C-alpha cells in the first residue's frame, strides 16, 4: 500500500551508515564524503571527512568521539552565548545520547543537548540552545514560552522545519 511505499522510499533515500569511502556524513549542516588516509585524527579537507586508515575497523567509534569533541566546543559555546544574551543562568551543560529529543532542561537548570546537534547547521544549534534556555524561565511550552523563543530567534520555525526534514540524516549513529 501507499504507506509501505513511503517508508521503503524513505529508508532507500537515507540508508544506515556502513562507514564506506564516499558515504555522506553531516557536520554543521554540511555533507562531507567519508574517506580514509594516513592521518592521526579526523580531518576535514574540502568536502571530505577523513578518518585514520589504521583505525578503519573502529570508524564508527572514532567518528562518534570526534562528534562529541566538536559538540563540546561548538554547542557549549552557543549555549553560553545565548545564556548571556538572554540573562539565563544554568547550573551545567551536558551532552546527551537521547534517541528522541534534541535537548532538555532539568529542574535544577541543567541543560542537556544531544551530541548529534553538532551535525546540524549553526542556526539549528542556536534554536536548540534558545529553546532549552527558555525552559529555565518557562517550564512548559506555553504561549509565553514561544514568545520568548521568538524574541531571541524570530525565524525559529525555519530551524524546526530543518529538524523535521533532516532528523534522519543526523540520527544514523
Functional labels for PLM-detected ranges:
Residues 132:
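Walker B catalytic acidic pair
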Residues 1-127, 136-173:
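Active-site-proximal or metal-binding-adjacent scaffold patches in catalytic folds
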Amino acid at each position: 500500500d501507499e504507506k509501505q511505499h513511503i517508508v521503503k522510499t524513505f529508508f532507500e533515500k537515507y540508508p544506515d551508515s556502513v562507514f564506506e569511502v564516499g558515504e555522506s556524513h553531516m557536520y554543521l549542516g554540511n555533507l562531507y564524503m567519508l574517506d580514509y588516509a594516513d592521518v592521526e585524527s579526523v580531518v576535514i579537507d574540502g568536502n571530505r571527512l577523513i578518518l585514520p586508515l589504521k583505525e578503519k575497523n573502529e570508524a564508527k567509534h572514532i567518528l562518534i568521539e570526534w562528534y562529541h569533541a566538536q559538540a563540546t566546543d561548538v554547542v557549549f559555546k552557543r549555549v553560553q552565548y545565548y545564556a548571556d544574551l538572554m540573562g539565563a543562568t544554568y547550573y551545567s551543560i551536558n551532552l546527551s545520547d537521547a534517541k528522541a529529543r534534541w535537548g532538555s532542561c532539568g529542574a535544577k537548570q541543567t541543560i542537556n543537548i544531544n551530541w548529534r546537534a553538532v551535525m546540524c547547521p549553526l542556526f539549528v544549534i542556536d534554536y536548540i540552545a534558545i529553546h532549552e534556555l527558555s525552559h529555565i524561565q518557562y517550564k512548559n511550552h506555553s504561549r509565553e514560552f514561544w514568545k520568548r523563543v521568538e524574541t531571541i530567534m524570530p525565524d525559529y520555525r525555519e530551524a524546526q522545519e530543518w529538524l523535521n526534514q533532516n532528523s534522519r540524516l543526523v540520527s544514523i549513529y
